[in-house]
Amino acid sequence: DLSAAGNLPAGKLREFRMAACEGIDIGKYIKAGYDEEQLKQIRTALEKALDIDPYINPAQRGASIREIALGIGKNLDVKTYADEQMNWQQMRERRNGLEHRIDISVYNNRMYSWQQMREIRLGLEEHLPVEEYKSFMYTAKEMNKHRLKLMQEANKANDKNEETGKQYDDFTLLTDGKQMEAFIQVSAAGMKIPK
């Protein structure tokens, strides 16, 4: 019933009408004071049958509500990042961390900018020792430099391991740098050597 929408601004009226066409009632959100962008994200979430009510409030921007809906849609623990004191980019970094199954408690602090959170998250995804650069004293740009340096060091170590050998339970397979020759080094601990 659009008559209940009476004096709504055009944007809110459009969202009300679009929701009504889908059989969704967003009247309580309009009465609560949500703006047009928030109503759009709420309507979109409700169209997907996502239960966003426990996690949203009118103080959040539409983009924050979208991040919450994305997390619910992916069965993530939304309450770990649906923090009204964080901006939507910080919420996105926390959601991305949960999607990649990393421990977001390492950067779960609103004192980090979203760019700093991203650098820590990327380091965790790459299994780097982020403790070396996660200090608040580093800017996101400095964190990026530290992360890239750690990645280079890790790649060099991996390349060296590939050149020198691969460890198995009872022997080590050694190859030269060009992998043109291979040698097997047998471990006496794992083998029965006849006397």
List each language-model region with its residue ranges.
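General marker for long, soluble alpha-helical cores
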Residues: 1-195
